[in-house]
Amino acid sequence: MGRGRRCGHRNGCRTYAAERRRRLSAMFPGVRIVAPAGDLKVRSNDTDYRFRPDSDFAYLTGLGADYEPGAVLVMEPLADGEGHDTTLYLIPPAGADDEGFYSDPRSGEFWIGRRPGLHEFEVMTGITTAPLKDLPGGIRLANHPTKAVRRALSEMRMVKDEYEIQQLRDAVDATIAGFERVVEQLPRVVEHKRGERVIEATFDGHAREEGNAVGYET
């Protein structure tokens, strides 16, 4: 399945993510901040596990769900020390006019379907984008933000903004509706030789419809 279902649409979290970056910038004047999304992990041969971005990356960009393997957010301090210039480095999609269309199983649209391009990510996030190949080598070696930045982000994430609070409320409502669907399936559950899996499939399917996935695997 392709990952482009929200291509080109402005992210509802965009304004809140910009405020988070502004607050973080004020905490670390003159400091370069690097927040990678993380990479895909191989499950078997050319099959990868479902991608989940690093929480700090998702928090600062407003991108959640499965966006975007290999991406790196860089907040470069301005020369006067007042604020940061932010760039989101991404792997561009390999369309039909690119040899990677067939040869790259991770970026080729022949394999993974339509994906957002750089401009579409700019629309979604409000952040200037650039190809990942343009990311300076020294920055590329940074695996994660510094401990001080991670600590600050952890504390920021503990206090939820309006967008996050509404997302939590929506998740609660969706969870209740999911359990109601399970109750509707109970007659089938007791008759089926794998009734527990009927429950699992019902609830997990609802979670995928209304959100991204179940919040906890256990």
Language-model-detected regions and their locations in the chain:
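C-terminal helix-coil-helix/basic helical segment that borders enzyme active sites and/or dimer interfaces
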Residues: 11, 180-194
